Amino acid sequence: VVHHKHGIGRFISIDRIDVDRRTREFIRLIYRNNDKLLLPIENLNLISRYGFDDNNLILDKLGSNDWLLRKSSVKKRIKFLANKLIKNAAKRDSININPLNYSQLELDKFNEKFEFIETEDQLTAIEKSLNDLTQEKPANRLICGDVGFGKTEVALRIACATYLSGYQFVIVVPTTLLALQHSRTFKSRFSIFNTSVATLSRFTSLKEKKQILEGLKNGDIQILIATHSLFKKDIEFDNLGTLVIDEEQKFGVDQKEFLINKHPHIHLFSLSATPIPRTLQMSLLGLKDLSVIGTPPSNRISIRTYVQKYEQVSFLTAITNEISRGGQVFIVVPRISNIPFVENELKKLQLDISYGVGHSKMKEKEIEDVFLSFTNGDIQCLISTNIIESGIDIKNANTLIIFNSNLFGLSQLYQLRGRVGRSNRRAYAYLFHDSEKLINKTALKKLQVLANYENLGSNFQLANEDLEIRGAGNLLGDEQSGHVKAVSYTHLRAHETTVY
């Protein structure tokens, strides 16, 4: 816990002690050198939860100035970061741009190709985003929606409005797999306009890259899907109007700031199921506009989630239950080196199933082939690293098994779980971990949080839990935990008036 005046100590117990002929309750805290502090229960407001893993934690010393010096240092750092943050926001807010002007009739033609009925939340997000494009100020909106709730369709509408207004559109994604999926989707939807859509990734050949860069510069390419390849100084645009950052939690602040500083006049939209604490904090503070898509598509069923120590019998049951109902299984490991272990387990269990393997070290053609086989139902199980976290949508795959789940981040686990349950069939997620003796309390808590949030649309609440577990970190994101560990998240919030 953190005492407002004395700093970080350890809660021991609540004691009943006789004082002046009456019994009172005290909170017993331990500080460095085993010094004890008894806090009257009526002064409970003076302490708060520390909120971080206590491994290697050094308690404060009673009577020392260390705590006050740390608080002062963090306050100064927050003030510096807040000033920088506000300066950047004010700079963009002071820019005047030409509102986008598009044909609603043409946009309606584009919308008709959407195969589903929009939810109310989705329509609201689309309406607000399109309204942003018609303003004289650059947009800066976070669209937070659960996995499979329709964020991509919002991006497609934004892209169409941008294209119809005569501007170029870019969507940047974290993985080549997601880039491939978006490439297929965008080309299909924009085929009615004969729009030039290009994809730029690490698999793009030098010849293709040269042609794409030339097309972006002279305006021949109107829509670009790009991975981290976009963060290069040699990329120039003829008339860039809008940038969408998909899975924004996957990108570093330097990368995002690079694009904004290079193109200060563009509209910016960020898509995320589980926004990083910094982005969520910025939205909660009003520095970004926020749209939440919290309504699931019709007939969607929540995913049953189990957290448990790995046992062969559980592994066997999970696979056979899914295969017996004609479904498919995702098996995910944290490292490529873990894949042989899973293959060996499958052999030990003598399961008569077909499976494929996918990971980032494979060639593009190999990755495409294995995912195409899984998509077409030619193989029953896919063993992979977290490259499936984004960019694969298979309605027949409704069981997810994750090995060493404690090694993944909370948002990673949430994204991975979103690979299943994308139809009206009940889906299951099994988060296997090592013995509870071998993993720390924070990792176990993280897994339990995910299991607790089974309901559809729980991504925003889960991001808030992540905010509490990890802290907001540096407001500008140059350090994910930043100085918050020095004083705890609660005390960081106590200084948030600095931002205003």
Annotate the PLM regions.
Residues 152-160:
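Motif I (Walker A/P-loop) of helicase-class P-loop NTPases
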